[in-house]
Amino acid sequence: MSKGHSLQDPYLNTLRKEKVGVSIYLVNGIKLQGTIESFDQFVILLKNTVSQMVYKHAISTVVPVRPIRLPSATESEAGDAEPGNA
């Protein structure tokens, strides 16, 4: 994973796994809403009544409908290890 994706991928993956609704604002001002079905390096599949493939270079902002908690770097590396048990 490249350094530029160290926040983007876990953020999008959390939104996908928890099926959090999102508003995606495009650079031209259009607002799309739905849930993230899948994503890769270049696109996000957004599902509402239909699935739309949205190119990441066209996205300005991704806004979840509720706050989400991202796993910390130590949690994702340590797996089941609990904080404070070093």
UniProtKB/Swiss-Prot annotation:
One GO MF term: RNA binding
Transmembrane segment boundaries: none
Assembly and interaction partners: Homohexamer.
Domain of life from the UniProt record: Bacteria
Keywords for the protein's UniProt record, in alphabetical order: RNA-binding, Stress response
Family: Belongs to the Hfq family.
Protein purpose: RNA chaperone that binds small regulatory RNA (sRNAs) and mRNAs to facilitate mRNA translational regulation in response to envelope stress, environmental stress and changes in metabolite concentrations. Also binds with high specificity to tRNAs.
Stated name of the protein: RNA-binding protein Hfq
GO cellular component terms attached to this protein's record: cytosol
Entries under PROSITE patterns matching the protein: SM
UniProt entry tagged with the keyword Disulfide bond: no
GO biological-process terms attached to the record: regulation of DNA-templated transcription; regulation of RNA stability; regulation of translation, ncRNA-mediated
InterPro entries listed in its UniProt record: Hfq, LSM_dom_sf, Sm
Start and end residues of each Sm domain: 9-68
Pfam family, any one: Hfq
